[in-house]
Amino acid sequence: MNFDIKTEQLSDSVYAISLAGEVDLYTAPEFKQQLLEVIAQGAANVIVDFSNTTFIDSTTLGVLVGGVKRLRTNDGQLTLVCSDRNITKIFEITGLDRVFSIYGSREEAVAAIDKELPTSA
């Protein structure tokens, strides 16, 4: 099976989940478990990095929608990183490109979140 997942804490409330390979019916449960774990650990903002992902299916979309619902109840957000046109097209066709902010690189996603986070004076 061609799948790998890595989770990284970028700051107190920002986590990144990097997915590689195929995220489908068989691998999405592991992705869902990681996403729920970082939310339980206090993540308010989660970046899901599809940079090394070769395939997603409707199961993946369901995990993302479930995650964004949980995060938004705590004023959080789910941000996506994806530059693969085949994958971004799936978000456009389903209308989910209006639900998620999608960036071409992790740096862009982090910068966008940093701009929205309240600064401590």
Language model features by range: what are they?
Residues 3-33, 50:
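STAS-typified acidic loop motif
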Residues 2, 55, 68, 103, ...:
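Broad hydrophobic/π-residue packing in well-ordered secondary structure
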Residues 22, 92, 108:
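Acidic-residue sensor for enzyme active/binding pockets
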Residues 102-121:
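A charged, well-structured terminal subsegment
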